[in-house]
């Protein structure tokens, strides 16, 4: 997924965001994301315990939950009955609703999105998001993937896909075109880096999302990088903490994490909390709570790295660790996406992801449009600053 903070304009952000999470050949956001970091700003339920599997993909906001769903469902059904595009009609209804995080996927796009949340996808190994001026920018390149082998870098602009202009177009559509056909098929992308523009032919492949990476920086420091909360990622974080050397501190890197499955973020929180509240949220006005399991490591030194690309479920985790006094946060202000979306099936097989509520941190903070301010704001060499802080907590010697 991408990353940002406060999207310049919700509408443009919305659709891209929704994809940043998806890792589609490019990302996925969305549903959790879009806006981009800082200058670009590029996303269930019943709770109760750590594993409360909130599958509502966090992320959108509407004028009124059930009413919006009814309007969108009716618009799609009427369009299909008239021989028109149900998906297009649903998109227009979402636009009218004012749900800045609402998104509509056709059947194929939604299947790709859900596949990505399972940790695998067919694509070229790119994550993208919409910039404030409407361009599509690469936010991450998967190591060892087709794009990485071809020399594509984060920060490059994606100008075209098989000669289709990506400028000013929905990120969801760009992602769909990048994913395109089966593994082994080819796609020609137009790229720009500074004054250089070129075209590159990439071969699609089945790739792992690689959402959790663990690196021992020293005997006293273990860094756990989480790029998105896909299925199983929370338990992988817990396993990494259990395997860490007894006296090592943890650097939890959530920079650029556009969100994902809320339940996985809660499970990740359980790695560092010995029970207790992680977040509260409302769905259609009904209040719920999410709790950590009671077997976490509550004593190990912990520093969390965040930035403008940290959003949604990643912000939920950050807010819990910060409010509970469990970690020191370092970096820059997070994106500010504190809403919850849930899917609504539509005529013709499309799916609308609509905002049904918002979540709050243990202290009651709402993050939507505000984000989280780090305990130590830094923009220059944040990792080095984080190591220094961890050393002061006793995580290094």
PLM regions and their residue ranges:
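PDZ/PDZ-like groove recognition
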Residues: 132-138, 223
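A short glycine-leucine-enriched loop at secondary-structure breakpoints
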Residues: 146-157, 180, 243, 320
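Cleft-lining beta-strand/loop regions that shape enzyme active-site pockets
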Residues: 182-336, 341
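Second-shell loop/turn segments in exported
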Residues: 58-63, 75-83, 144, 160, ...
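Conserved PDZ fold ligand-binding element
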Residues: 147-172, 251-253
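Residue-level marker of beta-strand positions
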Residues: 146, 157, 186-188, 351, ...
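Intrinsically disordered, Ser/Thr/Pro/Gly-rich linkers and terminal tails that flank
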Residues: 1-130, 153, 168-216, 225, ...
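BRCT (BRCA1 C-terminal) domain core and associated BRCT-interaction motifs
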Residues: 329-330, 334-362
